[in-house]
């Protein structure tokens, strides 16, 4: 008997045609979802009119064979941030046996269409892959040259508090960002990772650290390289006081940051600082901590986070 989930979530974001405050154009949404994915109450009361979208995985965890698909169409001039309601769990793969040693994979596919002058931020909470869990995510982004896209990935491999490691589990990730130019669609950024086996132990991999995180920001084309170079220096300075190994580098039109260590909190704090700096660079309002995130460690108020 099969019991896999095949959940979908379709989101359309667009600016409102009317507003009580003519100085603020709010982003509103249309949503359709199937279990186990569910769009919770959406807020668009931010100072800049940004839409805040929480997505819930109502089953409480992912198992082998689950297939999740998220489609986002951000229309012209829309601005939004999307996150998961809670940390997500990937349980050990079902169906492992001598006849089927590979087990069953869980998969999540995300397709983002970001149109002209839009700003979309994809910032799910951490993913916890249990021992033996098999999880693959594929993210494809079509980004207009005038638009901005920021995404964060944060994964814990094994239940560290229970002294559990990933074991025979695997975490895979593929991020492909495309942009249009005079010659048609081209790769803006491509990033593929697999964390398993020797990569968990090697000094060129995680070096026995259980937490991995990445932040990618692809800027509007109008952002100057000089501004990005200055941003890179500031991002590196913001590592002060945090635990773990953090690197940050320039892309052709953006930045890429990596975290490896033992603390998801340190990773969140550093990514929050970088996120804040990207807003400052574009002269936008400072990030507001989402209602669904852990309030006991709000980095906008924590003494360890100066921003």
UniProtKB/Swiss-Prot annotation:
Keywords: Chaperone, Cytoplasm, Nickel insertion. GO terms for cellular component: cytoplasm. It is found in: Cytoplasm. GO terms for molecular function: nickel cation binding. It comes from the Bacteria. InterPro entries: UreD. The keyword Glycosyltransferase does not apply. Belongs to the UreD family. Required for maturation of urease via the functional incorporation of the urease nickel metallocenter. UreD, UreF and UreG form a complex that acts as a GTP-hydrolysis-dependent molecular chaperone, activating the urease apoprotein by helping to assemble the nickel containing metallocenter of UreC. The UreE protein probably delivers the nickel. This is Urease accessory protein UreD. The gene is ureD.
């Amino acid at each position: 008997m099969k019991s896999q989930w095949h959940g979908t979530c379709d989101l359309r974001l667009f600016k409102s045609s009317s507003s009580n405050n003519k100085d603020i154009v709010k982003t509103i949404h249309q949503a359709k979802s199937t279990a186990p994915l569910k769009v919770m109450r959406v807020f668009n009361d931010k100072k800049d009119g940004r839409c805040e979208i929480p997505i819930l995985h109502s089953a409480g965890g992912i198992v082998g064979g689950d297939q999740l698909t998220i489609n986002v169409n951000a229309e012209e001039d829309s601005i939004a941030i999307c996150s998961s309601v809670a940390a997500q769990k990937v349980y050990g793969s079902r169906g492992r046996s001598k006849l089927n040693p590979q087990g069953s994979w869980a998969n999540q596919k995300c397709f983002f269409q970001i149109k002209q002058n839009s700003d979309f931020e994809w910032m799910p909470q951490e993913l916890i892959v249990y021992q033996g869990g098999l999880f693959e995510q594929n993210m494809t982004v079509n980004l207009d040259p005038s638009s901005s896209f920021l995404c964060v990935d944060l994964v814990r491999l094994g239940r560290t508090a229970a002294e559990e490691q990933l074991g025979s589990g695997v975490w895979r990730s593929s991020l492909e960002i495309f942009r249009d130019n005079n010659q048609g669609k081209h790769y803006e950024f491509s990033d593929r990772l697999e964390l398993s086996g020797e990569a968990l132990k090697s000094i060129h991999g995680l070096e026995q650290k259980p937490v991995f995180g990445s932040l990618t920001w692809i800027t509007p084309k109008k952002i100057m390289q000089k501004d990005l170079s200055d941003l890179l220096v500031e991002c590196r300075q913001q590592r002060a006081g945090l635990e773990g190994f953090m690197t940050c580098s320039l892309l052709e039109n953006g930045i890429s940051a990596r975290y490896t260590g033992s603390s998801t909190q340190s990773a969140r704090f550093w990514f929050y600082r970088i996120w804040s700096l990207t807003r400052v660079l574009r002269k936008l309002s400072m990030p507001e901590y989402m209602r669904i995130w852990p309030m006991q460690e709000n980095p906008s108020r924590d003494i360890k986070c100066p921003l």
